[in-house]
């Protein structure tokens, strides 16, 4: 069980068998999430790590405005954290807490996946969480219509490439992007569809 006040969103495995996780905000204020304005930059959470012998601990230097997607480098030394309400991805040294780089993107970044080419892949929301909720959360819909973009980011230097920008037609509100071979596959907030775009 995750102890209060942690409110976990995304997780990523560490080489030693532990894992890191994004703590978005304290549970007691979680109901305010849909009232927040995009890119408000109000810091509410951070990244934590868990080990069987030590339990939960905060990773210093990871405070951010609604930390969402999180990944860790293959050697476990670097944490990559998407700050949903400050429209950026940040790389942090896991041991020292020092920021290695931070990169602004268009929209609010969601979950991160490491592609088979080693790049960081994620979608960003170009509509507010309130709009996403009103359009498709908890509703029986074929697909969500929220506009989104898809990014690839170089983990070494934070250089971003916007791969795709949608208008939400036929598939929208993407929450995950996974590169496999020549394609990037997309998940969504709701509906019964997955998306696919060509890989770079």
Name what the model sees in each region:
Residues 2-19, 25-27, 41-46, 58-78, ...:
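Beta-rich, blade/repeat-based domains predominating
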Residues 37-52, 142-156:
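Beta-propeller blade signature
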Residues 173-200:
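Blade-level signature of beta-propeller repeat domains, shared across WD40, Kelch, NHL, RCC1
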Residues 21-42, 123-145:
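Short, conserved, GDST-rich strand-edge loop motifs in beta-rich repeat architectures
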Residues 28-29, 47, 87-89, 129-130, ...:
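Structural signal for beta-propeller blades
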Residues 50-54, 93-97, 154-158, 198-200:
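Short loop/turn segments that connect beta-strands within beta-propeller blades
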Residues 20-22, 81, 121-123, 186-187:
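Residue position within the beta-strands of beta-propeller blades
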Residues 25-26, 85, 126, 190, ...:
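Residue-level signature of beta-propeller blades and closely related beta-rich strand-turn architectures
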